[in-house]
């Protein structure tokens, strides 16, 4: 029996996508173009900070200048302001300037330019500093301190729409990760010759069908970063690896063999080639097995599944370092790849169960019984624990070691992200252990639907927390822009999955373990 992708279902999904786009546009139009600052070196070697303000500022120019001077004085820095608004009026900046639209230079007095330590974390055009809190013997130059004051006293720079680009990365990675989790799961079942999951095979293949679409979104975000349309990955700015540049960062420069445009794109080709080719191969052989039968194709899938697991173990970790961990360029964790992997795997199992119950409500997949649902529920429960274990292991070791270059990652997240971070950890750990422990809960449709939906959203929030602190810093929000983009991606993701699901029978044929699986009762 095939799934019928009816016009009604398509229409409802288009409505969901459109509603998400409307929310996104409203949120996007409401973004404030607040502050943009860069450090410039003058001919005589002194430094100044050029700051441009645009519109919708929540304070007056005089109020802001007073606050910055006061904060700078507390840090032993003396600054003077040179108003540039009138100077640029003829260039289109100040033609309609008013109290909340202005531009000026901040001039540091000569003694303030004597630096203490190194410029730890300059990030090119939007020099913002990665260390927002001091730890141990970490020191900041007056330029860094002043930049920190600017971001504390003023509103965040979103001239390049960092919030929109960062959300695009969050959603692209989250939904691509679900497809990747399904690909890993089907390869795992092939390699272990599992019989319990045969009835889920076509659902897994349908979710894998998102990978080519998800790859397009990711490549677009990466290309935008390479072209400097966004500044999510600060190491992509050549200034930070140029010793003659004021923004030179020795830590990033030492990572250049790994964090370079050439190696980044070389590895991207490998990531996508391996994932997409294996996904296509598994699907092709699955359909071929329906027609031919026998064990030859099954044994080929067994070999390919084992090979994929080896490649995936390496590539999934390096992929997460390149795509996510390098956003916080100075920081690293050898456990990070496994933590990210556990998140995408559990998200995939959650979506599988939600989709199964929806299909059952539509009169499909009657061959999936309570025992099959119980088995998948056990995976959802177990991987939720794996996610929590890896989160705790990474956090505990970094916290206990108390090494400055490591704890800065959590210092950034213990600021304005503290409540959302701990809520995410609590939800993704407490809810499964309290509500999914029993056998009955893992078989219950209402329980799985409610808990699954909550966990699904909070694993999206988990990816949000991985990306945002290093790209928009403390100036995050979950508003119409975030909700709208998530809803649109979700609608498009479901559309692609259901479209793929409709192209083949819901139950495979000629699989060696099919009869065993159909009569499974536990």
What is the meaning of each model-derived region?
Residues 334-340, 405-425, 473-497:
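Membrane-interface transmembrane-helix boundary segments in multi-pass integral membrane proteins
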Residues 328-333, 403, 441-445, 466-481:
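Extracellular/periplasmic helix-loop-helix junctions in multi-pass membrane proteins
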Residues 145-148, 255-421, 514:
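Long, contiguous internal "core" modules enriched in hydrophobic/ aromatic residues
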Residues 218, 447-457:
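Central hydrophobic cores of alpha-helical transmembrane segments
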Residues 31-39, 162, 172-289:
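Transmembrane-helix bundle segments that line or gate the permeation/cavity pathway
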Residues 179-184, 216-217, 268-279, 342-357, ...:
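Hydrophobic cores of alpha-helical transmembrane segments in multi-pass inner/ER membrane proteins
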Residues 25, 314-318, 453-464:
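Aromatic-anchored segments of alpha-helical transmembrane domains
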Residues 1-46, 87-99, 111-160, 231-257, ...:
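Extramembrane terminal tails and long inter-domain/linker segments of multi-pass membrane proteins
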């Amino acid at each position: 029996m095939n799934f019928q992708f009816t016009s009604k279902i398509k229409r409802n999904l288009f409505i969901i996508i459109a509603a998400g786009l409307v929310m996104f546009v409203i949120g996007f139009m409401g973004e404030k173009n607040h502050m943009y600052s860069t450090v410039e070196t003058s001919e005589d070697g002194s430094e100044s900070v050029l700051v441009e303000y645009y519109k919708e500022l929540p304070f007056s120019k005089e109020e802001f200048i007073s606050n910055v001077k006061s904060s700078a004085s507390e840090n032993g820095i003396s600054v003077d302001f040179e108003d540039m608004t009138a100077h640029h009026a003829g260039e289109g900046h100040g033609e309609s300037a008013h109290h909340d639209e202005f531009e000026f230079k901040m001039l540091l007095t000569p003694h303030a330019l004597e630096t203490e330590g190194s410029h730890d974390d300059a990030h090119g055009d939007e020099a913002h500093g990665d260390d927002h809190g001091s730890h141990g013997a970490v020191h900041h130059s007056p330029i860094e301190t002043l930049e920190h004051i600017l971001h504390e006293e003023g509103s965040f720079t979103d001239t390049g729409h960092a919030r929109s680009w960062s959300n695009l990365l969050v959603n692209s990675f989250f939904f691509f990760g679900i497809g990747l989790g399904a690909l890993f799961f089907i390869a795992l079942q092939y390699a272990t010759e599992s019989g319990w999951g045969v009835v889920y095979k076509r659902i897994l293949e349908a979710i894998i069908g998102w990978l080519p679409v998800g790859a397009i979104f990711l490549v677009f975000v990466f290309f935008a970063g390479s072209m400097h349309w966004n500044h999510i990955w600060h190491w992509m700015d050549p200034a930070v690896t140029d010793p003659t540049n004021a923004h030179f960062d020795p830590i990033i420069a030492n990572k250049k063999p790994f964090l370079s445009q050439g190696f980044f794109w070389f590895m991207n080709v490998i990531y996508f080639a391996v994932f997409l080719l294996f996904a296509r191969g598994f699907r092709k052989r699955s359909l071929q097995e329906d027609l031919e039968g026998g064990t030859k194709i099954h044994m080929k899938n067994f070999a390919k599944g084992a090979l994929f697991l080896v490649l995936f173990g390496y590539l999934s970790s390096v992929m997460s370092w390149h795509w996510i961990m390098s956003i916080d360029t100075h920081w690293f964790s050898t456990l990070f790849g496994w933590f990210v992997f556990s998140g995408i795997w559990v998200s995939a199992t959650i979506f599988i169960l939600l989709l199964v119950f929806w299909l059952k409500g539509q009169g499909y997949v009657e061959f999936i019984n309570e025992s099959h649902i119980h088995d998948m529920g056990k995976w959802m429960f177990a991987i939720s624990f794996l996610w929590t274990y890896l989160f705790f292991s990474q956090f505990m070791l970094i916290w206990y070691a108390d090494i400055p270059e490591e704890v800065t990652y959590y210092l950034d997240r213990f600021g304005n992200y503290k409540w959302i971070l701990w809520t995410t950890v609590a939800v993704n750990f407490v809810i499964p252990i309290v509500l999914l422990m029993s056998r009955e809960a893992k078989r219950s449709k209402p329980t799985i639907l409610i808990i699954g939906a909550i966990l699904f959203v909070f694993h999206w929030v988990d990816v949000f927390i991985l990306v945002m602190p290093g790209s928009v810093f403390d100036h995050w929000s979950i508003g119409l822009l975030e909700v709208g983009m998530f809803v649109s991606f979700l609608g498009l993701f479901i559309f692609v999955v259901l479209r793929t699901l409709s192209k083949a029978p819901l139950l495979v044929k000629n699989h060696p373990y099919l009869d065993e699986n159909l009569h499974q009762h536990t």
